[in-house]
Amino acid sequence: MENKKTIYFLCTGNSCRSQMAEAWGKKYLGDNWNVYSAGIEAHGVNPNAIKAMNEVNIDITNQTSDIIDANILNRADLVVTLCSHADSVCPSTPPDVNRVHWGFDDPAGKEWSEFQRVRDEIGERIKRFSETGE
């Protein structure tokens, strides 16, 4: 069944938040959605994001850090920006793209507990979306 919708998680560096969101998205939405993530820049997958997801038995070592792909962006059924208010640069999207904003703090460079907190918050948000469509 290839009539899947496409969801595209975006943040600044495609290093932490959008990587975790992609993994949670594949877990909770993978049956009905093609799940992608990207950033304005590609900073590489943060080792602590990999470690945090491993704690919940999700392996993201094969995910790549990617710059926003206009083809995916323009055909996505839903674009989700994950930047916090503290981020000065959050990806902009074309006006015709269905975009929502789910803001999460950037754990990069912070305490380990921040990675765990943000991981859990993103997981809960995507789980709720999978159950309610909102």
UniProtKB/Swiss-Prot annotation:
Gene (UniProt): arsC
GO BP terms, alphabetized: response to arsenic-containing substance
EC number from the UniProt entry: 1.20.4.4
GO molecular function: arsenate reductase (thioredoxin) activity; protein tyrosine phosphatase activity
Family: Belongs to the low molecular weight phosphotyrosine protein phosphatase family. Thioredoxin-coupled ArsC subfamily.
GO CC terms in record: cytoplasm
Protein name according to UniProt: Arsenate reductase
Keywords on record: Arsenical resistance, Cytoplasm, Disulfide bond, Oxidoreductase, Redox-active center
Function: Catalyzes the reduction of arsenate [As(V)] to arsenite [As(III)].
Pfam families in alphabetical order: LMWPc
Gene3D superfamilies: 3.40.50.2300
NCBIfam families, A to Z: arsC_pI258_fam, PRK13530.1
Alphabetical list of InterPro entries matching this protein: Arsenate_reductase_ArsC (IPR014064), Ptyr_pPase (IPR023485), Ptyr_pPase_sf (IPR036196)
Cystine residue pairs: 11-83, 83-90
Entry keyword Oxidoreductase: yes
